[in-house]
């Protein structure tokens, strides 16, 4: 009995649910081509701003024993660079499943302008609006301000008619899950992506008695194994609270087929990999695909839909 990882997502069919997390291995067209040619089912571009950004001073990304700490500050080549890439790729591969395109403006107005540019373009893929970047000095995360989140989405959906998902920060309180889900259920969102890194962690080099990243006096977003329980909780919380047509992308702590199975069991439709992709490179997709298939076959599952979201309670 062979397990199939075929995944249907927003009228697209992908060979498997795996993709990169925006921010990892997607800065340049060369890296994007490597993702496109890898065993990943889909891929997403680097979160784009209006103009090119250098980001924060280095060192700003460090691998640590159970994951990573980063304070990148949204370095990217600007929206025109990535829009040109995806439009060219659409023309070259018209039958390929949809590409994901990420934007992350420094203000509400910038986000609206970025989305207007996508709306007015010939891009026919899926857009992800990042409302959760924790590493831009002086800029709070929009998605922790519930009124501002609602106000932003109200303005977005006046004009944006293409498939749109939003990337969310981790939430830690049941009341917050309830409040944000109630807001999101009011809008024609395609999906939510949970979670972005856990903001403002601190990792210390005992030998040097020093922090390990330069920006923000060493404070940075935490990813990898450290965040998996929080990521699973957020995936589950949104899967059980959002309208069934709003899908959940699971991100956080996926480095094995077992981790992937857990995210799917919590209700994730697609899976994004960041920290481990940074460590292993694109070959991770082939490994993790095999590991997930092995788990499914051992359990007698032939498709992901047979167990997605069916987490048992005690």
UniProtKB/Swiss-Prot annotation:
UniProt cross-references to SUPFAM superfamilies, sorted A to Z: FMN-linked oxidoreductases
Entry note: cofactor: Binds 1 FMN per subunit.
Co-factor(s): FMN
Amino acids binding substrate: 46, 70-74, 130, 196-197
Enzyme Commission code: 1.3.98.1
Superkingdom: Eukaryota
Enzyme kind, highest EC tier: oxidoreductase
Entries under InterPro entries matching the protein: Aldolase_TIM, DHO_dehydrogenase, DHOD_1A, Dihydro_DH_chainA_dom2, Dihydroorotate_DH_1, Dihydroorotate_DH_1_2, Dihydroorotate_DH_cat, Dihydroorotate_DH_CS
Presence of the UniProt keyword Cytoplasm in the record: yes
Catalyzed reaction equations: (S)-dihydroorotate + fumarate = orotate + succinate
Active site: 132-133
UniProt pathway: Pyrimidine metabolism; UMP biosynthesis via de novo pathway
Annotated GO MF terms: dihydroorotate dehydrogenase (fumarate) activity
Cellular component terms (Gene Ontology): cytoplasm
CDD domains: DHOD_1A_like
Subunit comment: Homodimer.
Similarity comment text for this entry: Belongs to the dihydroorotate dehydrogenase family. Type 1 subfamily.
Matches recorded under HAMAP family: DHO_dh_type1 (MF_00224)
Protein name: Dihydroorotate dehydrogenase (fumarate)
